[in-house]
Structures are given as C-alpha cells and as structure tokens.
A protein has these predicted regions:
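Histidine-/acidic-rich catalytic cores in large beta-rich domains
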Residues: 1-373
Length: 373
C-alpha cells in the first residue's frame, strides 16, 4: 500500500493548480454555451449569466450632499451601469453632481485584438467580456485621453470619443495608475516570464511576481522591476518570501513630484498590503531608502500630502479594533502617525475591507471612497 504525505516547506503549486482546475469545471462547462459569431468571437453571454437587476437601491440618490459645496472639482467615476449592462467612466462635476462626459469604448472589439493564445489571456474574452468588464483606476490625461485596465488585464488608452488608441498586453496590469514627472505612467503589473530571482526559485505557473512598471504615453514599457527582487536584493526579505503565491500584492505606486528633506523627486512610495508595509524606493539606484510599518493592515493608496507627510488608506483589517477604516498621516519629522477626520469617518460607519481610495484636497478637505463595506 502506498501513501502520500505533505512535506513541510515544499511549495505546493502543482497541487494548488490541480485544485483550481477541478473547481473551474462548472465554469468551463458554462463557457461552452456563450454565444459566438462565425469568427469564434464571443458577442454576448447567457441570460442566466447576466447580473441580476438591482432594486434595493433604486429609490436612493446616486450622491448625497452632506454640506454645501461650491468647489470646482471634477470626479473621475468608473461604475457599472445596470441599464447598459456594462462599465462606464463618468466625469462628474462635484458642485452640482452633473455628469459632463462619459467614456465607454468597444470592449468586444478591443478583446478581439488580444492574443488569447497567451496563457495569461486565454480566458479574457469570457472573464472581461463587455458585460463583465470593469474600468479600473482610470487616469484622464490633459488631452482628454483615458488610460485604464480591467484588473490583471492589458493596459489600454482611448481618446475623448472612446476610440481605442493602443493596447499593451506585454504584462498583466492591475491596481493604481499614476502619472510620473515626465508624463509617463506608473502602474503595477504581474511579470511572466518571472524576473530573474523569482524565476530561479519558482518554475511553476501561478506565482504573482508583482512589478513596478513605467509605461510611455505611447504604450511602451520603459522600465519594469520585480518588487520581490527589490526586497531580496536590498536584504529586507529573503527567499522565503517566495513561498507564498501572492507575497506582495502591490496596490499603489506613488511617485514623488518634488524634492524635500525626506525624499527626492522621482522616488517612489510603494504600498505592499501583504506585508503591511510602505516601501520608499529609489529606482535610479535600486535602493530601498526606508520601509514604514505601523498601525495599519491591508492598506491601500499612499499619497504625498506635504513636504514631510504621507497619507495611508488603512483598511484596518487587524485582529483587534477593525470596525472602521482610517486615513493615517505619517510625519517624517516626528516619525509618528495621526488620524485624519477619524471622528467623522467613525460617525459615518466608514469601512472598506480590501479596497478604497482617499484624496486630501488643497483646502485640507478629504474625499474618500468606501468600495466594499
């Protein structure tokens, strides 16, 4: 009689992949019934696969005004339009909540230009079909063009009339999209093939080799560096970091737009929620200058708010005192944390488990997004 045992310390990627394949059998059966045209292009999905019509919030207003607001500010709002059964991006004027423009490009046409024979995108025409696709972290540029992705998907750019300009499918892009000082774009990606250190340690598919990626406005990758490599090369972590399939989960890259006593222009602040750290990194020298740990967990959205402070969106998924999310301010002079508008956030039962954004405006007020309460 033979027996099977699990050996401590061995990375069980193959077992995990087999388990995932078994779990996906019902979904793969469902895929077979998706409607296609003569070119084998998916055009619509089953009626049974469409999202249910939401009636719970039909009587509620889209926005609620709590105080008078005469700020001349525009909000870039990606949302799912239940009537159109697709994702759109609205440009909303906050002083009166009027939608002054909407982006909604042809998702099916874009998907048909993507190489589905690439293992990273073989299910894209199903997973990111028009009825499922979501615009993530759209960035509006000065000429009205929009750069976005669908989360772990190609990066793309459309014009103000929603015409597709370019697609980059070299990597899978995810989370934040930020403008650099030279008008390039910083965006997280997942590298495959893996970076050198990761590739020498792992040969199975399924590891998330998250990287900082700089993309030109023409869609070309100018710079890419694995965050796992950064941490290992700077001796902050060792190879044991790679024993977890998603050790980093990079969700924000914040470039420094100016010099200060505490950072240099073009330095980067990286949010790494899996290890509950903000890493201060200098790409020009491949050096981690500092890494910040503190009273935050599963954080999102690090922003530079002054010449000596950064804000951190603390999702606050700790084992204790986790009822509300917080916006923390870290002071580089005092090396201490404080909370921004915490009383108001608690009064409004502010909590988002794994997502969310915040923006501190020039007048000191703050805009927060509660994404999954």
């Amino acid at each position: 009689m033979s027996s099977t045992r699990l050996i401590p310390g061995v990375r069980l990627f193959q077992i995990r992949n087999i388990s995932v394949s078994l779990a996906e059998i019902p979904f793969n059966i469902l895929r077979l019934s998706f409607k296609k045209n003569k070119s084998d292009e998916i055009i619509i999905q089953n009626n049974s696969d469409k999202p249910p019509e939401l009636v719970k919030h039909k009587s509620k207003s889209k926005f609620e005004r709590c105080i008078d607001n005469d700020k001349d500010i525009l909000l870039v709002l990606p949302r799912y339009d239940g009537n159109k059964k697709r994702s759109v991006v609205d440009i909303v004027q906050l002083k009166d909540f009027n939608v002054i423009h909407t982006y909604e490009h042809d998702i099916t046409s874009m998907n048909n230009q993507i190489n589905i024979y690439n293992s990273e995108y073989e299910n894209l025409r199903v997973d990111d079909s028009e009825i499922r696709f979501e615009y993530r972290h759209p960035l509006i540029l000065n000429d009205g063009t929009l750069v976005s992705h669908g989360e772990s998907s190609p990066l793309f750019k459309i014009d103000v009339c929603s015409n597709l300009i370019w697609i980059n499918q070299d990597e899978r892009f995810h989370h934040s999209i930020e403008l650099s000082n030279d008008n390039s774009i910083w965006v997280p990606s997942s590298m495959y093939p893996y970076s050198t250190i990761v590739g020498n340690y792992i040969d199975e598919i399924g590891f998330f080799d998250d990287a900082i990626t700089k993309v030109s406005q023409d869609g070309e990758i100018l710079f890419i560096k694995s965050v796992s490599e950064i941490l290992i090369e700077n001796k902050i972590k060792d190879l044991k970091l790679l024993d977890v399939y998603d050790p980093i989960h990079l969700n924000d890259i914040q470039p420094a737009k100016f010099d200060s006593s505490y950072w240099k222009k073009n330095d980067l602040f990286l949010s790494l929620p899996r290890v509950n750290e903000i890493v201060y990194y200098r790409p020009s020298t491949n050096k981690v200058i500092n890494f910040i740990q503190g009273p935050f967990s599963w954080q999102h959205d690090v922003d530079i708010t002054s010449d000596y402070e950064i804000s951190i969106f603390n999702n606050n998924n700790s084992l204790t005192d986790k009822n509300h999310s917080e916006i923390l301010i870290y002071n580089f002079e005092t090396k201490k944390f404080s909370k921004k508008f915490n009383k108001s956030l608690v009064e409004n039962n502010f909590k988002t488990s794994t997502e969310g954004l915040s923006e501190i405006l020039d007048d000191g007020s703050m805009l927060v997004e509660e994404q999954n309460h």
